[in-house]
Amino acid sequence: YYVQAAEQLGDKTPADAEEVINTLKTLDFNTIDTVAIMYDATDYLLGNPMYNDDNPTDPTQFTGNLEASLDVLQSLYPQIRIIVMSPTYAYAIDEDGNYVSSDIYIYNGRDVLSTYVIKECYSSNLHSVSFMDNLYGSITEDNAKEYLTDNLHLNVKGRKLIAKRFEYFLNYYSKGYASQE
């Protein structure tokens, strides 16, 4: 699957893809309880296409890549809990280099960042996996300056916020965890 995805992505294959693939190959997924998948807003900022209605598992598309990954994980390891984590807020950059709202700025002719998150949530629901909304649930347009180093990347405080939220999300249904707040 990895090789096929890289072939379809061609020159859009990330530089560290081989390292990631080799790392994944060393894991024994039969010993793993939970897999967390988190996308940032890079696909949106690059204007990458989001979905292909004719091929919902097209790995060259934002949701197609997610759908294909969920299909593979669920078919090979049905015992694993999967948590899909949405991107946090990211500023779009306009033609003049200014940070602008990603809720109004369209890169590829049809989609704003929140549409990516909605599609990601929809894919998660189709596969009956957990979905953790970071766009509206943690780092938002209102507080992004406090948690980002630039328009996209989390600072230490932002990483800690997401880690704390993930820990809570991961353990919420564990016996007594929610009552420890």
Language-model segment annotations:
Residues 1-56:
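Conserved SGNH/GDSL esterase-like catalytic core that processes O-acyl groups on lipids
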Residues 33-38, 81-86, 127-130:
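Structural recognition of the beta-strand scaffold that forms the well-ordered cores
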Residues 35-37, 70, 82, 121, ...:
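Hydrophobic beta-strand residues in large extracellular and virion-surface proteins
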Residues 48-65, 101-109:
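Active-site cleft segment of glycoside hydrolase catalytic domains centered on the general acid/base Glu
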Residues 66-70, 114:
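Generic structural signal for well-ordered alpha-helices
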Residues 73:
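Hydrophobic pocket-lining residues that define ligand/cofactor binding sites across diverse proteins
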Residues 87-181:
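Catalytic His-Asp segment of secreted/periplasmic serine-dependent ester chemistry enzymes
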